[in-house]
């Protein structure tokens, strides 16, 4: 079974039994190149539903169908930019079509599944496995934005490692690029409706890609439904060539950043402030600002530290990162009059104020009890007292440490959430379609009753509530916390035709909201937590969840994975490659200490300074503080770095840093223990160099620095005849001519 089109550079051979791909062929410079594949398709159906121990929905008594069989004649049709070949198949009792799209723009081949109406079938998941065969052991793997270092020798990948999807929390470009001296192969996990789970491994000369789509549907509700699986291309040149190619792929798919952030954002220093008190291990309280007045009284110090923006968290411990009532400012943040005064006093000092806002759900006593009871009877109940460190490992599919800390958090906050909540939210009866539900009709959630951002009426409610906050408080932006937190299925009658589409519904909501708020206030900031490309479509700024594992991997060698970063130079290369495949104009907020990194570790090891020591934290602060984009810090993280923060703020305001181009120190001249980044504009440049080792480092400079003047010294340096010498655990920032 062969598929080809005169307008496509690629031809596809299908397994005649399964209808799945077995061979890709492409003519390059007159020579026919081939890539053998082995694919399987699995469908999980029917069964029963229950709450998972850590919230959401899990299934049991399901049937897993594995026998995919071709089931009819191939048909085809053309669109403006592709020829589509439809191959009918059956997987067990489920009928569907495989769509092979030969594209004239973007990746050469895209594969999707298409379902039509079938009674009595509940699809719970769809799994697509791809084996890229006969991969040379000397091949190089790049999976930018994930937990693998750049240019990874494929034979190093002994484990199965997660790949974050386009809509993931630790999001990425979702590309898997494999290359050797003769060829390259690219797989792109390009579903941006669901949030799939993907993992890669290498064994027996095969690269294995497993895609768990998280697609779910009651097929009795379906007319015709298409689910993207994966796109392929090969012989595209080296990894260094790929970002330019991928940029055209993104634009073909309409994945783009607005690329017009407020002018104040790029050099911003963001101060994350907490009102009230948070609770850890039941007896430990953290209360930097008990009341609004305490934060107002600290504004001058905050300004002198170099901060230009305050990110105000919801009040702790209630409602914390949950919804009480969007319209009740007093309960959600603090007395409205005082919050308004905080904004006014901040504005007088040239400090912007943005609010942390929640989408995932509303608290009431019913759901709090359900969540807490689930923790007490769940798999982490005996681990709540266990010591936890950083919640993110290099492997994006490893949530073990986080789930222990999350379970402890639920028990710690349970009495405060219970005291502040109504017995049952009135919204449940007033607006039943606003919530995720089991097929039984029961509301689903993690530790709130989960809102479904796909519901158009709820979108109007949320938009109105957010506009009310702007009008009443004169704030300067929002940070949308955890908008994809409800990454499970909604089986409500109106949503069950595509039950997994709710998890990313916030992206459409944000695209509708952006012009309304920009019209109200042109320099208003849209900022969200997930790092994935799907979440960058309507955002000026994204959080750096994808970067957080780098801090621990660099500072704590015992945590490193064979396939992760192992040096400062690796970290620089990782950032460079991650940024190279972001949509143009994307911006990331960097940090080392946030409320997230503070909340999840055990008491006594919450701050990076407690984990790694102040000396190392000073290096990390300069490293992440002077990356392109804003720097943010949680209140209390300034201890031991008070002198560095104003200097970082001053450098970030320099037009060379804000408007210049980047040069990363990645050549063979630069030792592994050196982090180097230069920004240059016309004939001037600023260079940051950091020696993370405990020994003096001497090396040839990648660029001429004879004209250099120090802007910041954390340690000492010398420069003689183009040879740099940096003292142990040191950092320097130099101003100099550009070559």
Locate the predicted segments by residue.
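Acidic-aromatic substrate-binding/catalytic surfaces of carbohydrate-active enzymes
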Residues: 1-88
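Beta-strand-rich recognition/accessory modules
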Residues: 4, 90, 170-258
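Polysaccharide-binding surfaces and accessory modules of carbohydrate-active proteins
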Residues: 35-45, 50-53, 74-86, 90, ...
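Substrate-binding/active-site clefts of carbohydrate-active enzymes
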Residues: 257-264, 274-290, 301, 305, ...
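Aromatic/acidic polysaccharide-binding cleft in carbohydrate-active enzymes
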Residues: 276, 484-487, 586-648
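Substrate-binding cleft/loops of secretory-pathway carbohydrate-active enzymes
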Residues: 363, 369-373, 525-564
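Glycan-recognition and catalytic regions of carbohydrate-active enzymes
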Residues: 527, 576, 634-686, 692
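C-terminal beta-strand-rich structural cap/linker in extracellular carbohydrate-active enzymes
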Residues: 720-739
């Amino acid at each position: 079974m062969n598929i080809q089109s005169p307008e496509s550079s690629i031809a596809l051979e299908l397994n005649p039994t399964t209808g799945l791909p077995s061979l890709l062929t492409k003519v390059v410079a007159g020579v026919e190149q081939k890539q053998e594949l082995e694919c399987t398709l699995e469908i999980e159906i029917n069964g029963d539903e229950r709450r998972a121990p850590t919230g959401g929905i899990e299934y049991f008594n399901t049937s897993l169908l594995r026998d995919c069989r071709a089931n009819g004649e191939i048909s085809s049709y053309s669109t403006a930019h592709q020829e589509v070949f439809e191959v009918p198949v059956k997987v067990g009792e489920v009928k569907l079509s495989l769509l092979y799209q030969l594209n004239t723009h973007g990746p050469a081949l895209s594969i999707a599944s298409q379902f039509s109406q079938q009674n009595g079938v509940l699809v719970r998941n769809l799994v697509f496995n791809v084996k890229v065969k006969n991969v040379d052991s000397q091949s190089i793997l790049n999976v930018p934005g994930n937990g693998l270092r750049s240019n990874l020798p494929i034979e190093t990948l002994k484990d199965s490692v997660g790949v974050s999807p386009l809509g993931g929390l630790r999001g990425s470009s979702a590309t898997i690029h494999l290359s050797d001296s003769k060829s390259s192969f690219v797989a792109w996990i390009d579903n941006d409706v669901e949030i799939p789970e993907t993992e890669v491994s290498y064994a027996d000369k095969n690269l294995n890609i497993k895609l768990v789509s998280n697609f779910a549907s009651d097929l009795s509700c379906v007319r015709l439904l298409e689910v993207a699986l994966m796109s392929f291309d090969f012989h595209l040149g080296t990894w260094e060539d790929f970002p330019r190619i991928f940029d055209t792929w993104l634009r073909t798919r309409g994945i783009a950043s607005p690329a017009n952030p407020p002018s104040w954002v790029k050099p911003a220093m963001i101060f994350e402030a907490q009102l009230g008190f948070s609770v850890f291990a039941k007896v430990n309280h953290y209360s930097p600002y008990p009341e609004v007045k305490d934060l107002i009284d600290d504004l001058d110090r905050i300004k002198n530290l170099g901060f230009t923006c305050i990110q105000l968290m919801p009040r702790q411990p209630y409602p914390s990162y949950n919804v009480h009532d969007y319209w009740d400012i007093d309960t959600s943040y603090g007395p409205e009059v005082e919050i308004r005064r905080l904004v006014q006093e901040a504005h007088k000092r040239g400090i912007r104020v943005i609010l942390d806002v929640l989408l995932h759900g509303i608290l009431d006593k019913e759901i709090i009890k359900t969540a807490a009871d689930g923790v007490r009877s769940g798999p982490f109940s005996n681990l709540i007292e266990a010591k936890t460190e950083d919640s993110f490992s290099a492997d994006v599919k490893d949530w073990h440490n986080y789930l222990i800390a999350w379970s402890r958090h639920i028990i710690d906050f349970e009495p405060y959430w219970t005291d502040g909540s109504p017995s049952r939210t009135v919204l449940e009866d007033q607006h039943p379609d606003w919530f995720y539900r089991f097929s039984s009709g029961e509301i689903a959630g993690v530790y709130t009753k989960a809102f479904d951002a796909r519901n158009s009426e709820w979108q109007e409610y949320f938009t109105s509530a957010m506009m009310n906050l702007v009008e009443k408080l004169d704030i300067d932006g929002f940070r949308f916390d955890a908008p994809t937190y409800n990454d499970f299925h909604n089986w409500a009658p109106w949503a069950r035709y595509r039950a997994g589409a709710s998890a990313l519904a916030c992206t459409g909501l944000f695209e509708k909201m952006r012009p309304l708020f920009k019209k109200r206030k042109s320099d208003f900031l849209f900022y969200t937590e997930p790092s994935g490309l799907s979440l960058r479509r309507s955002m000026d700024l994204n959080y750096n969840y994808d970067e957080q594992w780098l801090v621990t991997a660099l500072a704590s060698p015992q945590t490193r994975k064979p396939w992760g970063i192992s040096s400062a130079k690796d970290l620089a290369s990782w950032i460079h490659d991650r940024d190279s495949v972001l949509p143009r104009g994307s911006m990331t907020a960097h940090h080392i200490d946030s409320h997230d990194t503070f909340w999840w570790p055990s008491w006594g090891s919450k701050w990076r300074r407690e984990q790694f020591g102040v000396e190392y934290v000073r290096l990390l602060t300069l490293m992440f503080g002077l990356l392109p984009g804003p720097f943010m810090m949680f209140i209390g993280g300034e201890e031991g770095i008070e002198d560095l923060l104003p200097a970082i703020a001053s450098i970030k305001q320099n037009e060379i840093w804000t408007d210049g181009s980047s040069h990363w120190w990645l050549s063979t001249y630069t030792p592994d223990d050196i982090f180097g980044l230069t920004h240059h504009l016309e004939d001037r440049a600023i260079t940051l160099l950091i020696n993370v080792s405990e020994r003096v480092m001497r090396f040839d400079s990648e660029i001429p620095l004879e004209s250099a003047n120090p802007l910041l010294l954390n340690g000492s340096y010398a420069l003689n005849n183009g040879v740099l010498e940096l003292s142990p655990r040191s950092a320097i920032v130099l101003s100099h001519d550009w070559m």
